[in-house]
Amino acid sequence: MTDTLSAPAVDTLTQLRAIEDPAELEARLVASAKALREDLIAAAPEAEKLTHIPPHIERKREDAGLFRMYIPREHGGLEVAPSTFAKVVIEIAKGDMGMAWNFCLAANHALMLANWFPVEIHEEVYDGGLFKAASMYAPTFTAEPVDGGWTLNGVVNYCSGIPYSTHFIGQARLPGKQENGAPRVALVLAPADTFEILDDWGRTLGLNASGSNSIKFDNAFLPSKYLIEDADLTFYNFTDGESPGSAAYGNPYYNARHMSSFAMMLGMITVGAAWGALDEYASLMVTRKTTVPPFIQRTLDPDFQRYYGAAKVQILKGEYAIRETWLEWERLATTSNGAGGNIFDDQADNLIGCVGRDVMLDMWDVVQELYKTIGSAASTKGERYERIFRDMAQAAGHRNPQLKDMAYRFIAKDDFGVPRF
């Protein structure tokens, strides 16, 4: 059921690619994302019913060039910095968190493709800038060697952004064991024609617009060029050398670590959603009165003023944390390892990822706290705040925040020289 859309408006893309100043390009992309907000709010009920982004919204994001942000310029992309990507995603999530999740988890993996896969397949896969890829790192399907490639079998759940994806990036179990007895895994880039998208999304508490369907491989043939043996997506990096993308395009962002970037990605989605929640809270402050005497407009009530102000500070703190940490990620990626004591190693990757997870949970706390005073009408099914609340609850229960305590322990072990395992 993969939906496909044609290339974006040529004039818009030509204009974007002609912009040489990164700040100017960022401003243009952020403005395009902001311009979509009212459309996203209006389309949110339809997106939940469809369980993914409605085609007319997907078209608008295509026309704005937003899916091309991480794709190399050599292959039709814009090749922006992650800090720019973050600002755009936050603006999209202000409109609707589910559709932001759908968008972000399909657009984000263009960065990883250049990082991990051989340059020989980049032109074909990026396809002039049309590349989108859902991803899931749990190795729940198998790859068996055959002449010229591999046969894939199995089901992968929670493939967020898959309805419009041209590819899937994930991990397959290989025959045999590693020397230490652990299972062998491979990094897989599977074109959309190798799998079936299952109609099994839309029954969770929230994020029903995220297009997080399962996919099924049924004796699918995968050419050998799309699989990297014994490469674990969780740890696969090039900190001791140069990645295919970094070598080909001279962009160090294609040479960095990505467990941190994934957690940061989820953090920036929740920041945008929290701003959307505060926006809805503010609209009700203007139109509603307090529930106790003297029954004044909420904007005039000292308690509601405090509720609003406290929430705004917490969200702003979360956004600043995300922005500043992305700049640190970029600095580590662009500084030669060891220069000035900078090493983008597993320790730095883990620490940066912890910031993203903490922001996720902090934003959930903000939305929960506002819910206590917004009023019961806001929790009516179909109301904007009700949808944001459900989406944020679903995000808080995501597997990534569940890594929090283990990651905290790793920080202490790393600092005190204690082996992680």
Mark where each language-model region is.
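Intrinsic disorder at enzyme termini
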Residues: T2-P22, M406-F421
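Glycine-rich beta->alpha junctions and the first turn(s) of the following alpha-helix
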Residues: L205, S212-I315
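C-terminal helix-coil-helix/basic helical segment that borders enzyme active sites and/or dimer interfaces
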Residues: I41, P45-E48, L316-D358, Q368-S376
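N-terminal-proximal low-complexity accessory segments that begin disordered
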Residues: L13-R17, R28-A33, A42, E48-L50, ...
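FAD-binding subdomain of flavoenzyme oxidoreductases
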Residues: G149-L222
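Glycine-rich phosphate/cofactor-binding loops in nucleotide/flavin-utilizing enzymes
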Residues: I374-F421
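Glycine-rich flavin
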Residues: H52-D63, F67-T166, G176-A186
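Generic structural signal for well-ordered, non-transmembrane alpha-helical segments
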Residues: K34, M268, G272-W275, D279, ...
